[in-house]
Amino acid sequence: MARIAGINIPDQKHAVIALTSIYGVGKTRSKAILAAAGIAENVKISELSEEQIDTLRDEVAKFVVEGDLRREISMSIKRLMDLGCYRGLRHRRGLPVRGQRTKTNARTRKGPCKPIKK
C-alpha cells in the first residue's frame, strides 16, 4: 500500500478512485493531481513506480488536505460561533444553517424526537 498524506492508498483501485480516499480530494481534484503528475487515470496504484508515487505525494502536498483541512473547517465554524452572527447561532444550537425549514423535517440536524412529559 502506498502512503500519501498520511493515508494508506488502496493498491487494487484505479488511481483516480484511490486518491479520493484522502479527505479533501474528490474526483475532480484527483484528476487534476494525476494530470499535473503526468500519470494516466486508469492505471492501478500497484502498477506505479516509486518515482511516480513521489510525484503524487508532491502534488497532493500542494493542497490543504486531511488534518489541516479538518482543522481549517472547524476553526471557521468556531469563528462564526464566536462572532455571534446568525450562522454561528445556528451552528451553536445544532439547527440547519442554510435556510432550510425546521417546523417539519430537519431531523438529522436536530436529532431524534424528544417525548413530551406530562
Swiss-Prot record:
One Pfam family recorded for the sequence: Ribosomal_S13
Keyword terms, alphabetized: Ribonucleoprotein, Ribosomal protein, RNA-binding, rRNA-binding, tRNA-binding
Entry's Gene Ontology BP terms: translation
Positions of region (Disordered): 94-118
Family per record: Belongs to the universal ribosomal protein uS13 family.
PANTHER family, sorted: 30S RIBOSOMAL PROTEIN S13/40S RIBOSOMAL PROTEIN S18, SMALL RIBOSOMAL SUBUNIT PROTEIN US13M
Protein name per the record: Small ribosomal subunit protein uS13
